[in-house]
Amino acid sequence: MTYILKIKPARAENRHGNELEYYPSEQEELVEEALRKLACDRLNGVYLGPGAGVQFTMYELREEHRKRGHSMSHDELKRSLLICRSAGLYIERKGGEREVILDSSIFPTVMISSRRDWKADPKNARCYVQFNPLVTASIEVLTFRQFDYETLMSYSCQLSRWLHKRLYHNYVNAEILNTYHFLLKSVKRDSGLLNNERISQDMKYLEQTLEELNKKNIIYGFQKEIRRGKYNRIDDVLYKLMPSIEFTNEMKKANKRAADIHTKSPARLPAHRKL
């Protein structure tokens, strides 16, 4: 099954008051991850109407980013929230007749306290964000998985975070003798983060990412098999990842948690519910 994703840029003011177009970036990714973490803490997660969301203060959001080494100012956080509110996501299933799966922003609803309220009482000036409908759907049909958030937020490389989440979601049968395989071209296609002119540069960047995963004890090591095409040029590279003991233990815990949730959960909405 093939899907097409289109992203429409948001329009927001910069610090000089000029309105510009912004595509969601690494900063917006970090803001969304932090908000999902806050939703799991101290009963901040809420359901209002049909969607899951989170109530928080800008102080809490700033502190969460500061603790993870990604400090942002009040204005930077506000701009990221507004970009997530305005940037459009359009997903359709490609086939004989294209079927629209999703037409929404990253955050359909955003309520931000005023700067005056924030300055007067920063720890109690409440804000609210409604998550994307796909997040709500994942909660309703229990397709989410437990993963190591602290390690995720400690990476210096955006591709490291992408691969970290990919492994936690897909590598459910992680064992020391069961390696995880992927092709360089598949990472380039799926992540959108390998945009170098030469394949050798993509290899270098990806292998720097794998070294970072190794330092974080996610993988024990990796091997690569270079595949050559015409004129002996590199056509693709097959990577084989060897999981660390720490990662295999984490996956066993995540699998048990997922099994417990499915066993103990009440009746759920059907998996193919229209959004």
Predicted regions and their residues:
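Charged, alpha-helix-forming regions
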Residues: M1-L275
